[in-house]
Amino acid sequence: NGDIYIFYLENRPVGYISLYRREESIEVREFFGISRGVVESMYAFIKTYREYYSELIIKAPVKSKLNFYIHNQVAMKKNESPFIMGRITNVESMLKRLHLKGSNLKISVIDKIIEENNGVFEIDINGNISKKDKIENDMEIDVSELNQLLFGYFSMNEMIELERVKINNTEKISELEKLFVKKKVYIQEYQ
């Protein structure tokens, strides 16, 4: 029962909003514009609903900067609450799907729930993945932290700084940094 509005500039789509109307509020679940001007125009559009709804809720990724486009910061309340949860159920399969070519790495994964995920995963220069039991590794990581790396929630540098990963071969840090980069996470889960 929601609405999707697509915004155009010179017959090209430049942004969209997905919103749901409730009794007293309007909830924006997806909000994307390609430039500052587009985002400001979209906010102006949403403000027209203020006449009919007492509350406007905009859901955005945790590290989103959307709130800085709102001119009246005093009238705004920002709550950050991550509402997405992911779980790697098969580490070897997940690594194979990523096509990690160009590096020779040995990543030790620790999973306290799924025993099959424990081990050292060797990635060769061609992107082939093989699981080894007990060999020296370049990096040790818990499966939950690996999940955050793979989805781009944290960069490799941030994981090292936060001590969420153990680096056993410092010569491999630059390779790891190239493989695991921070990205915007656009996965949305609705309750």
Region roles according to the model:
Residues N1-Q191:
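Intrinsically disordered, low-complexity, positively biased terminal segments
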